[in-house]
Amino acid sequence: MFSVPAISEDRFVEYFEIQIAQSDTTVITGLVGSQIKDSVFIAKTLLKNNKQKFGLNEIKDFHIHFTNNDIFKDGPSASLGIFMAILYYQKYHTKMKLINSDFTFLVTGDVDLRGNVKEIGGLKEKRKFFRKENFSLFVIPKEGNEVLRYSDELSCDNIYDTLSIIEKRASHVEKI
């Protein structure tokens, strides 16, 4: 199982868990809206259509459960994080490999079917959380954010930029 934290009201919450599905379909459970569901299927489509670029032989169906059913989850800003989590899970789950590192990063952005990372709202709150929690890197959409405020904040146009940024900043993270 692979779990990913997220931000809610300036605190971490366990956001979702991913594991291989026992069926031949991707399953989404939890208290989520249509934008979150769309983000999961966009991520899966991008991975299926570009699996060789990501070093994947196949894309396994999975069950993704959005935890904390007392908190409704929706909005496009989680798209990039969902994509990254599904990519890492697809890449490493069969090897049972966990990346143990002091390098922690936060990503935010709305991902479309071409892999572009689009502008999102609430960036002020996300920056505040990033500073408070002392992450190593914060990756935000380039669209709408021409001025970066901190040296540990970088912007991206698409999912490939995001992966390149993370690989360059974290030399000890295995290449994707």
Where are these regions (language model features)?
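Peripheral, non-AAA+ core regions of ATP-driven protein-machinery
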Residues: 1-176
